[in-house]
UniProtKB/Swiss-Prot annotation:
GO terms for biological process: intracellular protein transmembrane transport; protein targeting; protein transport; protein transport by the Sec complex. It is found in: Cell inner membrane. Part of the Sec protein translocase complex. Interacts with the SecYEG preprotein conducting channel. SecDF uses the proton motive force (PMF) to complete protein translocation after the ATP-dependent function of SecA. This is Protein translocase subunit SecF. The lineage of its organism: Bacteria, Pseudomonadati, Campylobacterota, Epsilonproteobacteria, Campylobacterales. GO terms for molecular function: protein-transporting ATPase activity. It holds the Pfam family SecD_SecF_C. It is a multi-pass membrane protein. Forms a complex with SecD. Part of the essential Sec protein translocation apparatus which comprises SecA, SecYEG and auxiliary proteins SecDF-YajC and YidC.
């Protein structure tokens, strides 16, 4: 299936300046949200408990909330429907208990007046563990970006590497800010979505960069802008079909999945759009803004190819006994 004819070259770089300006404005607004409002840390990072309860009748959400609010230790409790009208999810901050106290039994005792129920899941994360998980989550994102920059530098050149990382940071900032806008708790699911997004977005960028390199080395194009336009146009069908496939799969997760996975599915849904956009409009344009020179790049790549060919020739001569 081909959405766009390969012979048709679209002028992406002509409009990329507008894309960069829009992205810069959105990124600044997103940074404002991140710094001034901040994330609502979930149980994974802040510590606390998550209780899944199923009733034999419709769950009395308001009554359950009132029962917990009467207890001084359970301030800030959140009660929401989970999957069906009979099932609810209860979240509350970490509660200190004595050695002889069982938190599970305490919660069950609080819920007794609300009707016939079954506690199906009870997870608790301590503050220390939550802090460690938060540090490891942030570290994993930083290491992923560094590893990608090293890899792209080795495969292409530093301008491409820096451009790809800037595009990825742009993606992460916008998606992370959407977590605040949609009032999603920052948990491990969100970190998993961000890491998945980084891998997905860099894959798109690498495919476009590969095609750009082929166009430049073929010397069919006169300048870098033309080479980039031809490269993006030739990979556009593949990029859009892949993105649409991922988009609709994640959309189904958002619509029909339970609330417990919304921390993964919604950031991924937004990230699919943002990642595809940045691979086409941001990463190539940033490489040009960083002073990428097509002639110098061609000379360096030609030198590398000749060096590799000479090594291969010497290896063959050595194996044949001529050297």
């Amino acid at each position: 299936m081909e959405l766009f004819k390969r012979t048709r070259i679209l002028s992406f770089m002509r409009y990329s300046n507008y894309g960069v300006i829009v992205s810069a404005i959105l990124a600044l607004l997103a940074l404002g949200l991140l710094f001034f409002k901040g994330f609502s840390l979930g149980i994974d990072f802040a510590g606390g408990s998550l209780v899944q309860v199923r009733y034999t009748q419709n769950a009395p959400i308001k009554e359950v909330r009132d029962l917990f609010e009467k207890e001084a230790r359970f301030k800030g409790v959140q009660v929401s429907e989970f999957g069906s009208k009979e099932e609810i999810l209860i979240k509350f901050p970490f509660v200190e208990t004595a050695e002889n106290e069982d938190l599970n039994a305490i919660v069950a005792n609080i819920l007794k007046p609300s009707g016939d129920f079954e506690i199906r899941k009870f997870d608790t994360v301590g503050p220390r563990v939550g802090s460690e998980l938060k540090e490891k989550g942030i570290l994993s994102l930083i290491l992923a970006l560094i590893a990608i920059m090293v890899y792209v530098s080795f495969r292409y050149e530093w301008r491409f590497a820096l451009a790809s990382v800037i595009a990825l940071v742009h993606d992460v900032i916008l998606v992370a800010s959407s977590v605040i806008v949609f009032k999603i708790d920052m948990n491990l699911e969100v970190i998993a979505a961000l890491l998945t997004l980084i891998g997905y977005s860099i894959n798109d960028t690498i495919i476009i960069f590969d095609r750009i390199r082929e166009e430049m080395l073929s010397q069919k194009t006169k300048n870098a802008t033309q080479a980039i336009d031809e490269a993006i146009s030739s990979t556009l069908t593949r990029t859009l079909l892949t993105s649409l496939t991922v988009f609709f799969v994640v959309l189904i997760l958002c619509v029909f999945g339970s609330k417990i996975i919304i921390g993964f599915s919604l950031p991924m849904l937004i990230g699919t759009i943002v990642g595809t956009y940045s691979s086409i409009f941001i990463a190539p344009k940033v490489a040009l803004l960083l002073g990428f020179d097509m002639d110098k790049y061609y000379e360096n790549e030609t030198r590398k190819i000749k060096k590799a060919q000479e090594k291969e020739k010497m290896r063959r001569l050595y194996e044949s006994g001529q050297v």
